[in-house]
């Protein structure tokens, strides 16, 4: 304690810092060369149904392991400050942290000529920056009544700095477009899929039927929110206590296949007026504004598949 800093306003103040370094070996769920085949058909891509006469079959596992695989390494830095004012009526806290992940373990896709689908290897370098700010306010604090408010703000940015040599993105989930991927130079994770073809001004281009043209596959959205807010309050009167919590996430996208199929089959609310006309907001090949009407349920079904 420093006597020179004692006063009636600042009750407590602290500056903190920490450093940690952790290694992680990764998950080895399939550490065998071959796996038994049960059933058949579409899932096994074979017309045969196993077991046959009580005999099962084995197929090579689609994942191979890098013989030079090493643990991924995470270095964490954290800096922060805490301050309490007016006998802890107001408490403020701020924390900045950064995580650097090196040798991130991923399943990196391989060419079919290798006889495997992917290889578990050290395939990336990532970093995370986090800012967190909290405020606690306790305006009423008596023996029989206590009322407290809390507020917090969090902003987190995950970035993929690099992946394995020759690999631009790694699929984390999804069978067809769109997929969730880790892409070099992008936030982690991102939604990767078909994009619209655009002109030099960023306008979506349409074909001679008024339907949007498909562009190259790429990043079409990010999963993580821009920031998160939280609010909580609790009121205690004698032995009774009432609490409330409010959470808010701003930003971030998601893809709903259910909604897409509802649009395609005409069962969603926004396709209720499918007997009318649609003019897609875009430009034609000559650069003029699109004025081609899409009419009828069949044409609109084609529109929703784009």
Question: Which residue ranges define each predicted feature?
Answer:
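Extracellular/periplasmic, surface-exposed regions of secreted and cell-surface proteins
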Residues: 1-183, 235-238
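Surface-exposed, extracytoplasmic segments of Gram-negative outer-membrane nutrient-acquisition systems
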Residues: 54-62, 100-125, 157-224, 232, ...
């Amino acid at each position: 304690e420093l006597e020179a800093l004692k006063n009636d306003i600042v009750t407590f103040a602290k500056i903190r810092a920490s450093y940690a370094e952790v290694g992680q070996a990764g998950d080895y769920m399939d550490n065998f060369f071959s796996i038994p085949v049960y059933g058949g058909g579409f899932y096994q891509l074979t017309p045969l149904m196993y077991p046959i006469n009580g005999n099962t079959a084995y197929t090579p596992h689609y994942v191979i392991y890098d013989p030079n695989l090493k643990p991924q390494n995470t270095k964490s830095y954290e800096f922060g400050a805490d301050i309490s004012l007016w006998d802890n009526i107001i408490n403020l806290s701020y924390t900045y942290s950064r995580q650097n992940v090196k040798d991130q373990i991923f399943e990196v896709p391989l060419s079919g000529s290798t006889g495997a689908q992917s290889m578990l290897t050290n395939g990336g370098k990532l970093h995370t920056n986090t800012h967190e700010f909290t405020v606690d306010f306790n305006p009423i604090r008596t023996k029989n009544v206590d009322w407290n408010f809390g507020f917090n703000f969090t902003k987190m940015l995950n970035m993929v700095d690099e992946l394995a040599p020759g690999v631009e993105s790694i699929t984390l989930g999804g069978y067809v477009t769109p997929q969730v991927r880790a892409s070099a130079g992008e936030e982690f994770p991102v939604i990767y899929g078909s994009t619209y073809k655009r002109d030099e001004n960023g306008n979506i281009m349409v074909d001679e039927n008024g339907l949007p043209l498909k562009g190259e596959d790429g990043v079409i959205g990010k999963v993580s929110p821009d920031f998160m807010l939280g609010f909580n309050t609790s009121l205690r009167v004698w032995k009774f206590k009432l609490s409330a919590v409010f959470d808010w996430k701003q930003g971030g996208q998601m893809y709903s296949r259910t909604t897409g199929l509802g649009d395609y089959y005409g069962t969603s609310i926004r396709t209720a007026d499918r007997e009318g006309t649609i003019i897609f907001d875009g430009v034609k090949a000559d650069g003029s504004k699109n004025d081609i009407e899409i009419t009828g349920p069949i044409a609109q079904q084609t529109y929703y598949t784009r």
